[in-house]
């Protein structure tokens, strides 16, 4: 937790650029949910986000504004910067001890919502061309994208061609969707995916590649209803929160895996170890100075606990689970 706090403090060193004229001022009045130093009411922020940012699609936007362009319109005080740290610290405190991924996702969603991000999606990053295998916990998916957009993705196969997925596999940092849209390597079909996402309300977003223990790889996407670029500072905080979430989920998965490993007695471990070394029940009995029947009794218990029908398979499974070592 202290490491994340230090990273959060370093993220505050960024200072917004000067004011821009024109549409930036009017946009600031309608879509300021990204700055906690302004209106602290989440409900009012969301109202502006929903009512004030009704851009039709990503392509060809001449009036799009960024967090940087709003820097001159909104006075981001030191107290406001401190509030970012407070909110991140609150997220870390609230997630401490939580053992349900869906609950962790709900807490992360509430945190991201304060940055104007209504939509989130998390899932493992596979090595093949299947982009995002939806993670399920208690029969619920760890994403809150609109149902219509999820159905459209499945219908069109967008989950397998998303350019942010390809970029994430390269080990890049946070990816702005707008950058991928304008990238020369992005095809028209892939741009169409972004255009259609905007029609369903996902008008701007970022995707964060995540790395965890034992090589676990995942991605987390944050999307806004408002067509406005993400400030570098905002991305830094969302990346910290997403990384914390991923590490917590990975830890829970590891704990669950450990809990599912059957507990064998010392005698059972010793018997199955000798089975793995090719010894018969009679041989094991001589080595352990117990009867052959007692050896068979222990081996049958091992087979039952490991859910196998053969002693050889039981030995192999015991090795793979780390119960015994040759």
Curated annotation (Swiss-Prot):
Which PROSITE patterns does the entry link to? HTH_LUXR_1, HTH_LUXR_2
HTH luxR-type domain sequence ranges:
257-322
Organism of this sequence:
Sinorhizobium fredii (strain NBRC 101917 / NGR234)
Q: Which domain of life is it from?
A: Bacteria
Q: Which SUPFAM superfamilies match?
A: C-terminal effector domain of the bipartite response regulators, Pheromone-binding domain of LuxR-like quorum-sensing transcription factors
**What SMART domains is this protein classified in?**
HTH_LUXR
**Protein name per its UniProtKB record:** Putative HTH-type transcriptional regulator y4qH
Keyword annotations for this protein, in alphabetical order, are:
DNA-binding, Plasmid, Transcription, Transcription regulation
Biological process (GO) annotations? regulation of DNA-templated transcription
Annotated PANTHER family: DNA-BINDING TRANSCRIPTIONAL ACTIVATOR DEVR_DOSR
Q: Which residues form a coiled coil?
A: none
Any one GO molecular-function label of the UniProt entry: DNA binding
Residue ranges the UniProt entry marks as DNA-binding: 281-300
What's the family? Belongs to the autoinducer-regulated transcriptional regulatory protein family.
Pfam families, per the entry: Autoind_bind, GerE
């Amino acid at each position: 937790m202290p490491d994340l706090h230090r990273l959060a403090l370093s993220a505050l060193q960024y200072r917004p650029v000067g004011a821009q004229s024109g549409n930036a001022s009017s946009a600031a009045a309608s879509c300021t949910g990204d700055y906690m130093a302004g209106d602290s009411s989440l409900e009012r922020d969301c109202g502006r986000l929903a009512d004030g940012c009704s851009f039709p699609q990503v392509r060809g936007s001449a009036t799009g504004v960024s967090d940087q362009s709003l820097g001159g319109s909104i006075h981001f005080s030191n107290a406001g910067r401190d509030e970012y740290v407070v909110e991140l610290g609150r997220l870390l405190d609230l997630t401490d001890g939580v053992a349900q991924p869906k609950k962790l996702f709900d807490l992360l969603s509430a945190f991201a919502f304060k940055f104007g991000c209504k939509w989130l999606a998390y899932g493992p990053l596979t090595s093949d061309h299947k982009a995002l295998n939806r993670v399920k916990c208690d029969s619920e998916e760890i994403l809150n994208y609109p149902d219509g957009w999820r159905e459209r993705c499945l219908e069109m196969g967008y989950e397998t061609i998303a350019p942010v997925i390809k970029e994430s596999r390269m080990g890049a940092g946070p990816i702005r969707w707008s950058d991928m849209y304008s990238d020369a390597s992005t095809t028209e079909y892939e741009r169409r995916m972004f255009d259609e996402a905007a029609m369903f309300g996902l008008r701007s977003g970022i995707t964060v590649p995540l790395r965890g223990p034992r090589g676990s790889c995942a991605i987390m996407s944050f999307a806004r209803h408002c067509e406005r670029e993400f400030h570098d500072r905002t991305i830094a905080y969302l990346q910290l929160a997403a990384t914390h979430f991923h590490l917590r989920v990975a830890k829970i998965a590891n704990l669950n895996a450990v809990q599912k490993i059957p507990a064998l007695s010392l005698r059972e471990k010793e018997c199955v170890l000798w089975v793995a070394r090719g010894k018969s029940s009679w041989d094991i009995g001589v080595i352990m100075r117990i009867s052959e029947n007692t050896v068979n009794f222990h081996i049958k218990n091992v087979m039952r606990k490991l859910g196998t029908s053969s002693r050889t398979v039981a030995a192999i499974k015991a090795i793979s689970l780390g119960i015994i070592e040759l």
